[in-house]
Amino acid sequence: MVSKIMNKKYEKGLSLIESAMVLALAATVTAGVMFYYQSASDSNKSQNAISEVMSATSAINGLYIGQTSYSGLDSTILLNTSAIPDNYKDTTNKKITNPFGGELNVGPANNNTAFGYYLTLTRLDKAACVSLATLNLGTSAKGYGVNISSENNITSFGNSADQAAKSTAITPAEAATACKNTDSTNKVTYFMK
């Protein structure tokens, strides 16, 4: 009889251990799913930001075809086109937002011929900054930059992308160095011809 009681106690204990193992396994699976969900979400935001830049570039080039300059170009012009999806239009504040919660700023070169116009994505975290800084826009781009303070005043393009304008596409190693702000305050700028 004592033997039966002891066996029952061991069976209960074994059941609790099994339950704990199942809960631990479930927690591990949940953590993995959350990690991959965040990764997929960030990737989706980056792809949406790239699409937004491409759409804005296409709209600007279409609107200014045949014009001698990009004078007067700003976000309000793009707000009145279908190039920017409605969920990124902040018509109240006359701004274009980006998928990372920042803005897409556009403007002409400030009385110089170094480039035609610029597009800047703001409030990017480090990972988004690296991803978007390495976007190569081909022959329509005059240059690229990370964390530049006065985009419209750039008059020359050099070999560094860190707080300066670079004449060639930014490499992943350069982007990792230039995107140094860890508090989602990085900016990526594309200078267009």
Swiss-Prot record:
Annotated membrane topology: Single-pass membrane protein
Gene Ontology cellular component list: membrane; pilus
Propeptide regions on this chain: 1-13
Compartment(s): Fimbrium; Membrane
Residue numbers of N-methylleucine PTMs: 14
Protein transport as UniProt keyword: no
Domain of life, per lineage: Bacteria
Regions that span the bilayer: 14-35
Record PROSITE patterns: PROKAR_NTER_METHYL
Record-annotated disulphide pairs: 129-179
Record's keyword terms, sorted: Disulfide bond, Fimbrium, Membrane, Methylation, Plasmid, Transmembrane, Transmembrane helix
InterPro entries xref list: Bundlin (IPR007971), N_methyl_site (IPR012902), Pilin-like (IPR045584)
Family per similarity comment: Belongs to the N-Me-Phe pilin family.
Quaternary structure, from the entry: 10 to 100 laterally aligned filaments or bundle-forming pili coalesce into rope-like bundles. These form linkages between the bacteria within the enteropathogenic E.coli (EPEC) microcolonies that are attached to epithelial cells.
The protein's role, per its UniProt record: Major repeating bundle-forming pilus (BFP) subunit. Is required for EPEC localized adherence.
Protein name, as recorded: Major structural subunit of bundle-forming pilus
Gene: bfpA
